[in-house]
């Protein structure tokens, strides 16, 4: 599921390679912005992201299963006001928020977050009632661009109230 740009890239890749999938495990489908869509046991809402300048319509996701709501903020910089407007208008209460933390301990900017901007978003989400004292805030999506290794990030992230994701982590 994705935006039209993702679907177009997928179609181009499928045409470029002669080997086709033997089954229909991948069926591309458009997911419209700000429209909750039922996908199996999940309700998924695409929200506008800020990623790479050449990407016209990148998405982050709001995913709900039963009474649990995850705000999945990967491959994005700071959230747009229209995302906050949607979350506030729809009275979204996130149980878990997974933050892009590509820049780690370095100053962030552009289409990814670092711990500095994760902390700003965490505060803004709390101030707007989207998160509360029971929300789990988890940083994820690390890279070599972060200026620190995992063991260096964990204690600093904890000071800001973040859990630091690890391979195999289940929430």
Q: Where are the language model's segments positioned?
A:
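Active-site HxH/HxHxD metal-binding segment of metal-dependent hydrolases
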Residues: 1-29
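Extended hydrophobic secondary-structure segments that form protein cores and membrane-embedded regions
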Residues: 1-3, 27-32, 136-144
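Fold-independent oxyanion-binding glycine-rich loops
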Residues: 4, 74-76, 101
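Short, acidic Gly/Pro/Ser/Thr-rich loop/turn segments
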Residues: 8, 51-54, 104-106, 145
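A short helix-to-beta-strand connector/capping loop
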Residues: 19-29, 40-42, 93, 133, ...
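Core dinuclear metal-dependent hydrolase active-site scaffold
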Residues: 28-89, 169-171
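Cap/insert and terminal regions of metallo-dependent hydrolase folds
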Residues: 79-169
